[in-house]
Amino acid sequence: MKKNRWLMALAAVGIHLCIGSVYAWSVLTKPVMNEMGLSLSETTWAFSIAILFLGMSAGFLGGFVERIGPSYSGCISACFFGTGMIGTALAISWKSPFLLYLFYGCLGGIGLGTGYITPVSVLVKWFPEHRGFATGLAIMGFGFSALIAGPAMQYLTSTVGLVYNFLILGIIYFAVIVLSASYLRPPRKGEVTPTLEEVLEKQMALKKSSPHKKQSFTRKEAMHSWRWYALWWIFFTNITCGIGLLALVSPMAQEVIHMTPAEAASFVGIIGVVNGAGRIIWSTVSDWIGRGFTYIMFFAMEIFAFYRLSVTGEKLFFEIIVLLVISCYGGGFSCMPAYLSDIFGVRHLAAIHGTILTAWGIAGIAGPLVLAVMKEMTGGYELTLDLFAGMMVLAFVIATVLHLSNRKAV
């Protein structure tokens, strides 16, 4: 049966709307601390382990996802993520940190990783002439999810309790992911004109020679290139700083600018809008100005943003700066698959993208825990935010060198 590529995009967004609820974790931070008697850093470990397993499972299962196809891998994601959410309800009921880390962190994280990479390479093949737009479309739902999940979690927690919040959402997420995954598949002959292969051949002809001498790299070949390591580092930096802010933005807003818990939950929802919008807007912009220059812009803006965030206590300015950082954070995710396809080709994109996502796993540990531990040690966030600004300076330099290298090679 012939399928519609816009419905394919809707199915991709459906999967990411579910698994992207991890970005609303900061709404649950204080309720989990109070319910289980944990410290801020102990609670943050659940989120960090989930992101670690997201990155590791995406890195090691990228080739597996390519082999079995998006429908089957989507169902695997549903099983792991749904089980993780329902098991988290049990962990909270029993007040067991070990079970919290096991279900939300390990099992939920594997569901996140498989679900995250499942639709990306599929949509690139359905939108071959607009690969940046396609990856932004696929990943957009992951960012937008907090808009729905943040207020929903706050409402469910206040009405039916923290345990039933995880139980109800786990069942809903399982059903939506399975339904969405059942529609996904690559385009068949004649369904997309021009095909991805034809688009790439045309682009190669216009360039007259590939900057990297090969049109398509395998995962192993890509990882032997210095460009892979440069991309990994700028991806790691953007995520470390952005995800550290995301994981703790609700308690941070309550402490720094004195938001109420309800206001902080609403702000998390707004962050979800900006996170999602940044993914689709920046990836589309990157189709016009190039992926390399887009990353240079990200880091230039974030150097300013993190420095100013460390010294401001004014509510409106705080909100604007956080939203700017989150916009760049989301855009960094959506531009990366297209940047990889520009440099390494698309034949093994899912596998290569998976290896880059290991940076997300490590950053998921580094960002939130550095921010949480230094907050407990110093009583504030200023030193960590200054550190993040410094990391952005290094990433800016690396992104510039990579961009200039790619331009000279054409």
For the regions a language model picked out, list residue spans one by one.
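C-terminal transmembrane helical hairpin of 12-TM major facilitator-type secondary transporters
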Residues: 231, 241, 263-339
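Hydrophobic core of transmembrane alpha-helices in multi-pass small-molecule transporters
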Residues: 97-113, 317-331
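Helix-loop-helix hairpin linking two adjacent transmembrane segments in secondary transporters
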Residues: 142-189
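Interfacial helix-cap and linker-helix signal at transmembrane-aqueous boundaries
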Residues: 32-33, 64-65, 148-160, 165, ...
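Intracellular juxtamembrane helix-capping segments at the cytosolic ends
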Residues: 32, 113-127, 134-135, 331-344
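Helix-to-loop junctions at the C-terminal end of transmembrane segments
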Residues: 57-70, 279-290, 375
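Extracytoplasmic gate region of multi-pass secondary transporters
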Residues: 25-30, 220-282, 337, 367
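C-terminal ends and interior cores of transmembrane alpha-helices
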Residues: 79-93, 301-313
